[in-house]
């Protein structure tokens, strides 16, 4: 299912989430199962299915990583069940540095500063990756789409690393 079509939106990585939310509410009102309380059983089931599709579509398009995965899947690149890893050696080295810095937070003289530094570093890197992804994901060229897929993999890693940083931060305070 093409969620962009469901929400009458142009397929774009850079999406106006306010418009998405407005369309979501409109669709929810139109297909909500309560509107079909006196309908046939088949119509009730269809309403429940449509509501589930609308909810899935909204949750997919609302988040940049899942939106990018959806855009790539529409072009034949499915990242949802893959175990492919990033092969970019510079990224892997940066990843190791970040992991070491995360492990050393509790031993730092100033854990607050270390945490702030990592937040800043993650944010800058994420911004760079997101900008590159926005440029590449609209392409129809297979090699460029593979580059976009690698960028999505990096963003997924960054999400995991961000969650680890937040857990480390919570453990300290």
From Swiss-Prot:
Keywords: Chaperone
Single annotated GO MF: protein-folding chaperone binding
Keyword Chaperone part of the UniProt annotation: yes
GO biological processes: [2Fe-2S] cluster assembly; protein complex oligomerization; protein folding
Domain J residue range list: 2-74
SMART domains: DnaJ
PROSITE patterns per record: DNAJ_2
NCBIfam families with a match to the protein in the record: hscB, PRK05014.1
Family: Belongs to the HscB family.
Function: Co-chaperone involved in the maturation of iron-sulfur cluster-containing proteins. Seems to help targeting proteins to be folded toward HscA.
Protein name according to UniProt: Co-chaperone protein HscB homolog
Organism, scientific name: Shewanella loihica (strain ATCC BAA-1088 / PV-4)
